[in-house]
């Protein structure tokens, strides 16, 4: 179920402050965050976030198409090794 419109998008307050500081300083330094649940806002466009996936930090460069999505959507937590090969076909 989607979040109520009257509540607005959720963004971690500390992440919002860091993003505003980075915009003012116009620095290219990535913002390190553990907040995968935060929604990407229009003022985040052009910034780079290092999003933690439970193992390491994944760099996420925010573009206009990402606005409205969550940061965690762009840092996968599971690796898919692929389906097992058909053993009969290799003979």
From Swiss-Prot:
GO terms for biological process: ribosomal small subunit assembly; translation. The keyword rRNA-binding applies. Gene3D superfamilies: 30s Ribosomal Protein S19, Chain A. It holds the Pfam family Ribosomal_S19. GO terms for cellular component: cytoplasm; small ribosomal subunit. Keywords: Ribonucleoprotein, Ribosomal protein, RNA-binding, rRNA-binding. One of its GO terms (molecular function) is rRNA binding. It comes from the Bacteria. Protein S19 forms a complex with S13 that binds strongly to the 16S ribosomal RNA. Belongs to the universal ribosomal protein uS19 family. HAMAP family: Ribosomal_uS19 (MF_00531). This is Small ribosomal subunit protein uS19. It comes from Erythrobacter litoralis (strain HTCC2594). The gene is rpsS.
């Amino acid at each position: 179920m989607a979040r109520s419109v009257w509540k607005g998008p959720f963004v971690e307050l500390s992440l919002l402050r860091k993003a505003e500081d980075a915009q003012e300083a116009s620095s290219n330094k990535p913002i390190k965050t553990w907040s995968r649940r935060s929604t990407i806002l229009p003022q985040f466009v052009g910034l780079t976030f290092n999003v933690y996936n439970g193992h390491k930090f994944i760099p996420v460069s925010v573009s206009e198409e990402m606005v409205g999505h969550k940061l965690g959507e762009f840092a996968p937590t599971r690796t898919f090794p692929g389906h097992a090969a058909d053993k009969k076909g290799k003979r």
